[in-house]
């Protein structure tokens, strides 16, 4: 018998990266700025603690949850509220384009095991999301906001920053979760960039190639025909021919792509 059917509180599942929020102050931080005009996407609502705070403020909440064992408790948490729609689905495979009305905000305590790829996917595939405010591991937050030349700066930071303006809004103690994670967490806020490059897909391929081997100079990570053009383009951007990928800003990658593309 499942925990939900037996009447017991469902235990967090490690394989799903579940760490349920239990602190009201932290919930208010995540829900900050929401109004009744907002349609909110929440991923990983779990037992519904944060969901209740979101529903108090937003016009509508789309809650996407993969774990059937927590659904009874989630439904009890939101009670008779008519502005919460629960979608039982895998967040990495869910068709966000089918949500109606489409969400303009993300507010969530994201499952730790899917947070990195999920945030990038939402930025790439759900253009209606104008702002995101969510909790993740501090390590992931630092990777999102890393600056060129820092140890956390990589392809992920470049792509996130091409599509949004991320910042660490608040650092979170492990004690606000059940169970407490062994890592530190943070609330991240992202504002979608309206000036994201139209040739993002091509830039993304260049970024992936450029960071393939961090120890190599950037041109050596590119296919043969592009190496010479990359050296010339780097010089035009103020970088030497021995520049490595982590030295270039997101804007540099856009300019480099446009200079070396056929």
Curated annotation (Swiss-Prot):
<feature type="region of interest" description="Disordered">
    <location>
        <begin position="218"/>
        <end position="246"/>
    </location>
</feature>
<keyword id="KW-0949">S-adenosyl-L-methionine</keyword>
<dbReference type="InterPro" id="IPR020598">
    <property type="entry name" value="rRNA_Ade_methylase_Trfase_N"/>
</dbReference>
<dbReference type="InterPro" id="IPR001737">
    <property type="entry name" value="KsgA/Erm"/>
</dbReference>
<keyword id="KW-0963">Cytoplasm</keyword>
<keyword id="KW-0694">RNA-binding</keyword>
<feature type="binding site">
    <location>
        <position position="44"/>
    </location>
    <ligand>
        <name>S-adenosyl-L-methionine</name>
    </ligand>
</feature>
<keyword id="KW-0489">Methyltransferase</keyword>
<feature type="binding site">
    <location>
        <position position="21"/>
    </location>
    <ligand>
        <name>S-adenosyl-L-methionine</name>
    </ligand>
</feature>
<feature type="binding site">
    <location>
        <position position="65"/>
    </location>
    <ligand>
        <name>S-adenosyl-L-methionine</name>
    </ligand>
</feature>
<protein>
    <recommendedName>
        <fullName>Ribosomal RNA small subunit methyltransferase A</fullName>
        <ecNumber>2.1.1.182</ecNumber>
    </recommendedName>
</protein>
<keyword id="KW-0808">Transferase</keyword>
<feature type="binding site">
    <location>
        <position position="109"/>
    </location>
    <ligand>
        <name>S-adenosyl-L-methionine</name>
    </ligand>
</feature>
<comment type="function">
    <text>Specifically dimethylates two adjacent adenosines (A1518 and A1519) in the loop of a conserved hairpin near the 3'-end of 16S rRNA in the 30S particle. May play a critical role in biogenesis of 30S subunits.</text>
</comment>
<dbReference type="GO" id="GO:0003723">
    <property type="term" value="F:RNA binding"/>
</dbReference>
<feature type="binding site">
    <location>
        <position position="90"/>
    </location>
    <ligand>
        <name>S-adenosyl-L-methionine</name>
    </ligand>
</feature>
<comment type="similarity">
    <text>Belongs to the class I-like SAM-binding methyltransferase superfamily. rRNA adenine N(6)-methyltransferase family. RsmA subfamily.</text>
</comment>
<dbReference type="Pfam" id="PF00398">
    <property type="entry name" value="RrnaAD"/>
</dbReference>
<dbReference type="InterPro" id="IPR020596">
    <property type="entry name" value="rRNA_Ade_Mease_Trfase_CS"/>
</dbReference>
<dbReference type="InterPro" id="IPR011530">
    <property type="entry name" value="rRNA_adenine_dimethylase"/>
</dbReference>
<keyword id="KW-0698">rRNA processing</keyword>
<dbReference type="InterPro" id="IPR029063">
    <property type="entry name" value="SAM-dependent_MTases_sf"/>
</dbReference>
<dbReference type="GO" id="GO:0052908">
    <property type="term" value="F:16S rRNA (adenine(1518)-N(6)/adenine(1519)-N(6))-dimethyltransferase activity"/>
</dbReference>
<dbReference type="InterPro" id="IPR023165">
    <property type="entry name" value="rRNA_Ade_diMease-like_C"/>
</dbReference>
<feature type="binding site">
    <location>
        <position position="19"/>
    </location>
    <ligand>
        <name>S-adenosyl-L-methionine</name>
    </ligand>
</feature>
<dbReference type="GO" id="GO:0005829">
    <property type="term" value="C:cytosol"/>
</dbReference>
